[in-house]
Amino acid sequence: MKVFLSVLILIFTIQSWTKADDISDFEIEEMSVGESLLNYMDENSIIEKINSKSANYYPNNSFVVFSYKSEKFKIYDDLGIVINPNDKSYIIHSIEGTLYMNDCRDKQLEVVNELKVFFDRKTYEFLSSPNLNYIDDKTGESKVHYEDFYFKDNSAVRVICWSLSKKFLDDGYKNSLAVAANSKYFMNWIKENM
């Protein structure tokens, strides 16, 4: 049985869960890595998404990422979903929930602390990379904070906080908090190809 987890609810309430051994028990807006996207969207909608101008393809069309928004979402403003466009089962290899908010660092640390309780400590390595320069901002004024859970099976969960400069905000970008779950297959592909 899947353990239900909408990560940012953790910010507002305290709940207890069974310790999860891997990311298959981890859900973002009730979706999990390894599930078929067909459980949430019909095939025509998926095809429309992967053929849209806003979809981004990885090298050799191995994967495609697209934004998915739904009024049914309880926590996130939108999701980024990664699938293999040639897989007619449309298995989710990565899912990222994004919440647009200012001053996300404290909330990020709250989420990380709850995830440390949720996941079995023996199954992951934790790496914190706070206050890095955001690669797209050559001035160094925008910062990004990564908090990573690397699992023994090579899957990963990352909690990200973007604190953007005034110029980026004026250009229409938004500060945000994101939680991403990546399958071991996707993580292995990234290591080999990126």
Give a label for each model feature.
Residues 4-17:
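Sec-dependent N-terminal signal peptides
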